[in-house]
Amino acid sequence: MAQSPAAASPGAPEQGCPIRVEHDRRRRQFTVRLNGCHDRAVLLYEYVGKRIVDLQHTEVPDAYRGRGIAKHLAKAALDFVVEEDLRAHVTCWYIQKFVKENPLPQYLERLQP
């Protein structure tokens, strides 16, 4: 499982701990463990073509919302799309919002209409 460390920020899952996104390719999901191992935030995706993924759903438990956790998941998923030279269909409203707020060329050129 690949891990991508992110800078610690106020409101991180545990104060002083960086947000660490884990990528489980077999389950096709990105996760952030919260409160030890008890809770987790997740971003789900599926392959819908040979080189096309659908970024389907992002979920952060209510108690952890507003802390930037979904942003880390979205960035990790889009970075994966870029690194693997994939195309992305974005079903998830949050990832659509993330791309709109972060219109980086490397993300925009990979999006399917």
Swiss-Prot record:
Q: By its UniProt entry, which Pfam families does this protein fall under?
A: Acetyltransf_CG
Provide the family line: Belongs to the NATD1 family.
Kindly provide the name given to this protein in its UniProt entry: Protein NATD1
Domain N-acetyltransferase: from-to ranges: 22-112
Top-rank taxon of the source lineage equals: Eukaryota
Taxonomy, top ranks, is: Eukaryota, Metazoa, Chordata, Craniata, Vertebrata
Which intervals carry biased composition (Low complexity)? 1-16
Identify the stretch(es) annotated as Disordered.
1-20
Q: Where are the transmembrane segments?
A: none
